[in-house]
Amino acid sequence: MNNYKSDFLNHINERGFIYQISDSDKLDKLFSEEKITAYIGFDCTAPNLHIGSLMQILLLKKLQDFGHTPIVLIGGATSKIGDPSLKDKSRKILSYEDINNNVKGIKKVFEKFLDINKIKIIDNSKWLEELNYIDFLREIGSHFSVNRMLSFDSVKQRLEREQNLSFLEFNYMILQGYDFYKLNTDYNCILQMGGSDQWGNIICGIDLSRRLAGKELFGLTTPLLTTSSGQKMGKTEEGAIWLNFISEKDNHSTHPRDFWNYWRDKTESDDVGKFLRLFTDMPLSEIYEIEKLKNEDIEKGKELLATKITELVHGKDSDWKSKKRIVFKKKEFEKGYGLLSLLSHNDLGLAK
């Protein structure tokens, strides 16, 4: 594990947030010497964000907690195209009305985690929808190498599988690169952060700013949210696990009790420590002790994780506690379990 001089990079590294940094020594020096502005982009493909975005939101929160300035970039314009990064097929093209409604919905997610008065929430429609196509091709497109774009995993994997990649999607990384350039020009933003699948798009923005303005910008990516066995976290047979609870009838909503059960049931034993580092503020010394637990004892660690992350997302006052699934060990079931013991074991009680 790398040791960083800056408090911010050292902290997020210890908690497992760092996958790649474009120039770690220079960025570490900047974080040590000054307050910087960084951004993460979120597309508006749904009126809610799922747990795959939680790591990015918490990264912005940590940036804010360490006194730096986070920017949330809403992809009001790029959502009309769709990001092809590590996707097997083209995204469904949404109507403009759906995208506008989605923008309103996901802004509510950020309000739960971030101090809205101390961050900037910017929609890239502000500049992308004003572009003249011919001028954009001449002034921006001329700085992009198709040869290099074809080498990025987000494109290469689709082509290797002989899956269609539309010209519309191929333009996505150019627009995202331009986003980074504009945020640097208008807001002095020097760092783009995102999941590891965004590396190619981030590099495009770094290269563009160097060519257009001679500026040195930086990129930082996080690992994708996967289990030790390589399974992506965030979806079930019923659909995605969403961060905002809207209603049980809403297709883009997950009830807090189902949210708790998801983390309790889907977390693999080897991942309890990793997820506690990412999604809680528990001291590392306590997490190390939990990681030592084996076999059935680690199940208590899974329940602790489920509780901590549900309280983070839905609050301690949500009704998930009274509706979580009753869980007890197989050997306890085989030897028999009294009703009162069962209720006590699961923090339930009888009304008088």
How would you label these PLM feature ranges?
Residues 208-352:
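Conserved nucleotide- and phosphate/pyrophosphate-binding catalytic cores
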Residues 1-198, 202-206, 213-218, 231:
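NTP-dependent nucleotidyl-transfer catalytic core
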